[in-house]
């Protein structure tokens, strides 16, 4: 039985404080269940499973069942999984588990599990210990750089294992967001040549050009990235540096690019895009928008969490409000309509018209 606080403000705030302190338990438990294959086993089971059955399905020793049960009952209390106790006739009830709706985001083809595995990896997560020193230092070094001695993307080139986790996380997250973009955004209508700046190996453009057969895709990234890009129908790969020049097109696509940079660098990027656009061209940027007011609701909390990730990872990187993006558009010479279209999970499509 869970005791009630009975209107005791002191107890209510203390419980809230403890909740914040113990928050780390949730993602670390989630990571363990993903790594052990428990959530895959649960979502693939087709029926309610006991901890013993889940342990067996995940090929864990029988002795692990008790620990499995303890992890899953925590997740049940958070509505990640569902729990239904079964009466055993006077003995301790046996809990049977089924996946809750949110569980599908941690298993299967559209899983966000790779994102969790990257963010909770020791080589990444431990960099957050340097956040106080980075904030107090005032020397332009973010926590990640203080911890690893070099900027994040440079470090990724030295840690193949972590880089693989990062790439898997970005591919899965982009697949989800771009899939929703293609369902809900009409801004690609009428586009002939679409340039994806920072497009990686072309996976995003492949999704877009598969839907819009009339679009010729130009995938633009650094030479070492383009060197790994596969041949794709309807997509041309070009190597270069966006701070120097951008290939010509009537639309330029920027997916989660601007939040990596400070305002000065964003202006440089957007001006190079402006120069490369046709007369009536536009930039389509997919970004998270910060709410104007930090309200205590998930739709506001998640953008502010992402902003903290930028603060930890990249010097000058940050999430922005819609007015801040509109201001950047004006400063870069985009005199046409600026508009924001909501896509999915805090992501927006921003159109900067020339």
UniProtKB/Swiss-Prot annotation:
SUPFAM superfamilies: S-adenosyl-L-methionine-dependent methyltransferases, Winged helix' DNA-binding domain. Belongs to the class I-like SAM-binding methyltransferase superfamily. Cation-independent O-methyltransferase family. COMT subfamily. The active site is at residues 259, 287, 319. This is Caffeate O-methyltransferase-like protein 2. GO terms for molecular function: O-methyltransferase activity; protein dimerization activity; S-adenosylmethionine-dependent methyltransferase activity. It holds the Pfam family Methyltransf_2. The gene is COMTL2. InterPro entries: COMT-like (IPR016461), O_MeTrfase_dom (IPR001077), Plant_O-MeTrfase_dimerisation (IPR012967), SAM-dependent_MTases_sf (IPR029063), WH-like_DNA-bd_sf (IPR036388), WH_DNA-bd_sf (IPR036390). S-adenosyl-L-homocysteine binds at residues 198, 221, 242, 255. Its EC number is 2.1.1.-. It comes from the Eukaryota. Induction: Induced by UV-C.
